[in-house]
């Protein structure tokens, strides 16, 4: 059995948990992050459909994307599903099970396992980038993830 869980917009900044695994689509995430890092805050505000304050925060995140400390995906997100999951309280055995059976979908990394190391980010489904051939990011990932999961 495999479980898919969507990401959350709210993220946690740090964690001491290790060891981390590498996301399967890390190379694509790096390419997308580089393109986002090249944008100014006004363009980020438009692409992320967010406030100036959130655009500025995420501009900083993308500037530090390659140097920021990585945290396990299961601990990085802070939305309702993750609060109820209480990942901080999972045992090593629970995390090993989750690593084999849980996938987290997101618009930057595509598909994550719980212990994949990621950095805080924001990416919206409607963002259109040159890297995605000017298609909305959700359409870009749809083809890749469908092929991967089926």
Regions found by a protein language model. Name each.
Residues 2-89:
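Active-site helix-to-loop segments that bind/position phosphate- or nucleotide-bearing substrates
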Residues 87-150:
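Internal, well-folded beta-alpha domain core
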């Amino acid at each position: 059995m495999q479980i898919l869980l969507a990401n959350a917009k709210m993220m946690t900044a740090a964690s001491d948990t290790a060891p981390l695994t590498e996301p399967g689509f890390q190379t694509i995430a790096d390419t997308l992050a580089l393109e986002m890092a090249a944008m100014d805050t006004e363009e980020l505000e438009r692409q992320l459909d967010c406030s100036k304050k959130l655009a500025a925060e995420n501009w900083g995140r993308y500037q530090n994307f390659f140097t920021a400390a990585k945290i396990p995906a299961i601990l990085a997100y802070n939305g309702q599903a993750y609060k109820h999951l209480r990942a901080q309280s999972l045992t090593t055995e629970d995390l090993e099970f989750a690593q084999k059976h849980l996938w987290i979908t997101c618009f930057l990394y595509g598909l994550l396992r719980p212990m994949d190391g990621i950095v805080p980010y924001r990416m919206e489904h409607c963002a259109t980038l040159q890297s995605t051939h000017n298609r909305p990011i959700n359409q870009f990932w749809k083809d890749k993830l469908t092929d991967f999961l089926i």
